[in-house]
Amino acid sequence: MTLLFFGSLVLIADPLQSILDAQLSLRPGALLHRLWLSPPLDVYINVYMFNYTNVDEFTAGRAAKLQLQEVGPYVYKEVLSNHNVTYNEPNNTITFVPKREYVFAPERSVGDPKVDRIRAPNIPLMGVTTLASSLSMFAALGLSAIARQLDSQPMLEMSVHDYMWGYEDHLVELASRFVPNWIDFKSFGIMEKLFREGNESNVFNMNLPEPNDKYGARVTDAPRGYTVDSINGERGFKGWDYNEETNGTMCNRIWGSHDATLFPLDMDENDEFFLYRRTFCRRLPVKFNRTTSYNGLDAYEFVMEPDSFDSDVDNTNSSCYCKNKRCLKKGVGSVSPCYYNIPLAITYPHFMHADPSLLEPFEGLQPDEARFTSTFVVQPQLGAPMQGTHLRLQANQVVGKVNFNRMMSPFENMILPLLWVDLNIDVLCLSLRLLIHGIKWGFPLLQWSAALGMLLAGVYQLCSALMLCIWPPTKQFHKVDQVERGTAIQVIGAGLSLATGLRKSSLQLDPEEQLNLLFGGGSIIPKLAKA
């Protein structure tokens, strides 16, 4: 009965689910917590640079279009770790500081970024020129004179590494001295600003999985698990006019988005979520596309919508991106408020899904949905991103109207591609694959096997007991028992007769003969017979 009880208890109580719920949480000591502190994911950023090969011909009027050469990939491994973790029980959140390091992966790269050289836009000069032209004639004239004095050129020739991770610029250095509250750096690198800046100082506050009601159902009005609540105390983008009193709009909120490291375990095909990274300077909507699998692991594939970077003054989901009711062209998303108001923008690579007019000034751009679509793959049992994830976007320099600056006038009202990146996840490590297989198949199979084994053993014991009660031992066994008892009585009687004979006999036995008698010696028997 004990085995039947425990076997039934395993099937009814489902202790495996309770164990998984405890281990797949962010509570200290849990398995997921240990994985989350230092995620064992191989995340890589493939960087493709744009090399401007005919700048002199274009600026001199001898070429109608700029020729772009895509150079790459230069691959960097992103290593994430989470620090300064604090649990906030009253509001069911967790506070932490994510730190990302970028390690060059030469075996995956096309060349050495410190050796390879490109010619690309001078981002500080072009950015400040656009800002000055929008202010006044005197500002534009003054900046033009300073640029000539510093010999700043619209296009720079330098190593790929310096352009990505930082180079000293005289104009930036000058600005850092005169307007330190605005420009607080002396070198500039596009990858440095997009991915590394503020890397160790951003404090995230994230919602833990929502509590259940007394019936075990998810509380509907609670924040979704593993969504961002605030960053550095801000729940929205002030640069996009977030209003704390009204909780903002879908356009300028941060709260409710995911940082792309953890997702709820109860996701399904109807889910839609938002990705946040400072690089985007906005939330990016991601919608379910299909159920798929990688290396035998279940997966949900989500895709970014073609209009993810659009801005429309009449659409509340994107109207905040239109400053003074002026929007950028279709498919171009401004990120200026997050980068010192330098006119930068993000698009899909090669201006895919953007206004076709953006392609007209260039040769060498080829939009390709098969190559440039962004997909996000989530493993539903673990709630983690996995192989097949590709987040692809392009960084661009926005050049507006140029006044009183002859060097910059050839690039007026152009959006110049700088680079595009493919942030992707390589094959999951063996430990994660084993864990996911265990969650889906191994652990449930062990639980069912244990429960079934206990039930079968319990049924066998119960049946055996019932058979003994219904069919007691037969008479044949009683007869055999009587024969065995009779034989024993005869042996005992013979022994008693022998003892009596010894007592009456006058024969004296020496010790050796007594031992022979006890252990079956035959030489003493005749003496006993004569006695």
Residues of each region from the PLM?
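Extracellular or lumenal secretory-pathway regions
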Residues: 1-298, 305-503, 507-524, 528
